[in-house]
């Protein structure tokens, strides 16, 4: 007998991946340079030279038995210490290596965080629009995902919609700032209000409600925006991070979980992660890559192209009359479609070789996502196709 649950999931293939596959197939027909693929959030800039140099140096000058050997169950101590020191310096925290667990990307960090603070049957509350993979992450841990409807005017938290979803069975609240797909970063005021609410709700329900903060886009911030660090606002915070975007190394699958030193049972979180790894098979990430990122915590890829692309695309969308919130960061923008059915809108866009992702799977019907992590020249060239699309299908012309 096979696991029917996973077989059933075969019919729920990622919409993002489906549209990306359409782009690839269409590109084989007409040349990929003629397909304006805004589907997939894959970094489009190279990793920093320091990362390449670190890998080369480690491969050439480190004892291969050590370099390619197993790391400790709780991951590489020197990498954990370096991450803790970096976070302390940047955000005024007091982490030690004992509060850091290296993971296979932010997905691995989230898998561990959910199992650290919740037991099957409890619920996790998040906010639309949200990354669609949160649903299998949460349900795979035996939990229920509750989704707060979006506040579309600015994509900050609608507390009147959020509060009724939190009850005695809520284990954690899951946030993503800057957000995929909206690009919005939660303000300090929003985070303080969220922290105050969670303190009160924890007291009311008689147990700590954790905040799980998913932060893979932290370094991609625009216009000098300071992205507030959620763990500064709420003690019971587990931070989940990936280097995929900041270092442009998504295929290396490297990130970490950071447990706020003041959270409940802080000293137990990282050892618990070691035990969770045993149960899930989500064992330590590559020893080589742990050592490499340890040397690169103060650098990023050249992320400026994303802000350039965002400004170009935002101005074009506004000129075409789209309703759109200007992103604070990430490499996504999330406009309102020109009809209520965003799926139909995105299907029509494909006739003009535009690959756009409907917002339904992000918990926000009627909107669509554009991942502008592509060449700036291609962003500019896509405008002619976008203008033809909205003129032919909706009678909209550039203002």
Q: Where do the PLM segments sit?
A:
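Pre-Walker A segment
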Residues: 66-67
